[in-house]
Amino acid sequence: MQKYIKEARSLLALGIPVIIAQFSQTAMGVVDTVMAGAVNATEMSAVAVGTSIWLPTILLGQGILMALTPIVAQLNGSGQRKHIANRTQQGFWLATFLSIMVIAILYNSRFIIEAQHDIEPELAEKAIGFIHAIMWGAPGCLYYQVLRSQCEGLSKTKPGMIIGFIGLLINIPVNYAFIYGKFGAPQLGGIGCGVATASVFWAMFLMMRYYVRRAPTQRDVMPKKRLVLPEFHTIKRITLLGLPVGLALFFEVTLFAVVALLVSPLGVTAVASHQIALNFSSLMFMFPLSLGIAATIRVGYNLGQRSTEQARTSAITALAVGLMLASCTAIFSIIFREKIALMYNDNIEVVTLASHLMLFAALYQLSDSVQVIGSGVLRGYKDTRSIFFITFIAYWVIGLPSGYLLGRTDYIVEAMGPAGFWIGFILGLTASAIMMGTRIWWIQRQSDEVVLLRSER
């Protein structure tokens, strides 16, 4: 029992700074929406539409680069720190290629937005302007992710927390300047949010670069040469390891976007209630997500130490701590569901329906916790391909179809509206949690030689 308590302390020491870093990142999006909304509804809608295209695209890139975390953790644990600089440099090359891809997609976002024939021309133009502004922050965002993955792989999660929080603080005045044309900046409205956020991503990268170059704990992993040529076999290895994670994130974000579209014909009350439950769940999601990142670090490090038993302890502890935290957040969601809904909206119909949906959101948190921490454990074992297949099946084969059948049709029961989609979420995430748990159990039953060989990929 003592070893699990000790491991829980290590996981929380890594996970708490990540929670704050993730909160800062999420809050930047909230700040953009709120500050644009203070101008008028069109500006806020433009930011919302633009973000719905920007977010899945950049998350795909970030997910691929997250593969660096278990790679660095394994090298750190196995005493091969001298190879970390090379992996980080190749990570920068990969981030450069991904940035070009992201910018190319976002530059042509006009075709995606204008394909929606019922969108107002002014809203479309402002959304495109926002995307064309924020896309120049993609390289800064992805370069920052490379250095953050290096730090997290070395069990240094506090730099990401501090720099993420500073980025949030910078974002507010820079937003204000570009939205309203203050301090000599042009008045851009919602487009100014894109300019501000892109600028903040570059500032965060430069701050993280300064930390990495100056920190005593990072000196021995600094590259000997400033510039090295791309090693395509190394870049390929990172990509093959990270692509399933990136696609899993992409599938998750696009699933919620599709569900929002499917709920929209049900009326304003249904859409607002669904959005309240989803937004609050997203805030609670930071806890298991952060523990999942901590689990990746601990499992990867222990496998580098060639201790499959300790890696197993890390995995079990992370899942147990995650379930306990999810139980607490679920109980909190149930008890205070009406007060939470009132924080978002004071319309009695919206609050009533949102309070009802929060009951489903509470159950959702339990299975979501297991599946997201399970994903982190599998990343630590470098078993990322299974994450892709599990996520695709759980979200798009089980979750979305069952949600649609329950929410919009009367084939099984009378159409349940938004509640049907939330039951679909629960079914999909529960299936994902079971499949993740089964996969972890299968890996841990294999011989130490097989597990360690996989971890050295």
UniProtKB/Swiss-Prot annotation:
Q: In its UniProt record, which GO terms are filed under biological process?
A: sodium ion transport; xenobiotic transmembrane transport
- Family matches, as InterPro entries: MATE_fam, MATE_MdtK, MdtK-like, Multidrug-R_MdtK
User: What positions belong to coiled-coil segments?
Assistant: none
Q: Which Pfam families match?
A: MatE
State its location(s).
Answer: Cell inner membrane
Tell me where the transmembrane regions lie.
Answer: 11-31, 53-73, 93-113, 127-147, 160-180, 188-208, 243-263, 276-296, 316-336, 357-377, 387-407, 416-436
Q: What's a single GO MF annotation on this record?
A: antiporter activity
Provide the topology term for how it sits in the membrane. Answer: Multi-pass membrane protein
Which keywords appear in this protein's UniProt record, sorted alphabetically? Antiport, Cell inner membrane, Cell membrane, Ion transport, Membrane, Sodium, Sodium transport, Transmembrane, Transmembrane helix, Transport
Name one cellular component (GO) term: plasma membrane
* Superkingdom, taxonomy of origin: Bacteria
Q: Does the keyword Cell inner membrane apply?
A: yes
Family the UniProt entry places it in: Belongs to the multi antimicrobial extrusion (MATE) (TC 2.A.66.1) family. MdtK subfamily.
User: Function of this protein?
Assistant: Multidrug efflux pump that functions probably as a Na(+)/drug antiporter.
The protein in question is named Multidrug resistance protein MdtK
**Natural source organism:** Proteus mirabilis (strain HI4320)
